[in-house]
UniProtKB/Swiss-Prot annotation:
Residues 1-33 are annotated as: Disordered. Pfam families: DUF5319. It comes from Mycobacterium bovis (strain ATCC BAA-935 / AF2122/97). It comes from the Bacteria. To M.leprae ML0386. This is Uncharacterized protein Mb3446. InterPro entries: DUF5319.
Length: 136
C-alpha cells in the first residue's frame, strides 16, 4: 500500500483502490510556502507541543481541544495528530482535511492556554528558590 501522508496520520483506507470515492474530487490546492516568521511560529508550536505532551500525557491528557472559528465547535486533536498537522504545515504550507476524533472524552483534552500555564507553573516550581525570588 502506498500512502503519501505524513507519519502519524492513519493510513488512507482507499490508497491504490480504483474505486476510490474521492478520485472524482479535484486535487488539494497546494499551500503557499510559509514565510520565515510563520515557519518560526510553527516550529515554536512544535517545540511547545513536545513539552506539553511530556508534562501531561502521563497524567491521562490525550491532546488539545481547539474551538473552530468556522463551525464554533470544539475539535479534539491527539498529540500525534497535532504534531503531524504542524509538520505538514511546515512542509506543504497547508493541512489536509482529516477525520475528527471519534467519540472523544472531553476531560482528556486541554487548551493551548492551559498547557502554557501548566508548563510555566511546572518550570517555576522546578526552579531553585533563589531563582524564583529574583524573577519577582
Amino acid at each position: 500500500m502506498r500512502d503519501h501522508l505524513p507519519p502519524g496520520l492513519p493510513p488512507d483506507p482507499f490508497a491504490d483502490d480504483p474505486c476510490d470515492p474521492s478520485a472524482a474530487l479535484e486535487a488539494v490546492e497546494p499551500g503557499q510556502p510559509l514565510d520565515q516568521q510563520e515557519r518560526m511560529a510553527v516550529e515554536a508550536d512544535l517545540a511547545d507541543l513536545a513539552v506539553y505532551e511530556a508534562l501531561l500525557a502521563h497524567k491521562g491528557i490525550r491532546g488539545l481541544v481547539v474551538c473552530c472559528d468556522e463551525c464554533q465547535q470544539d475539535h479534539y486533536h491527539d498529540w500525534d495528530m497535532l504534531r503531524s498537522n504542524l509538520l505538514q504545515l511546515l512542509i506543504d504550507g497547508t493541512v489536509r482535511p482529516h477525520e475528527p476524533a471519534y467519540d472523544p472524552e472531553p476531560d482528556s483534552y486541554v487548551t493551548w492556554d492551559y498547557c502554557r500555564g501548566y508548563a510555566d507553573a511546572s518550570l517555576n516550581e522546578a526552579a531553585p528558590d533563589a531563582d524564583r525570588f529574583r524573577r519577582r
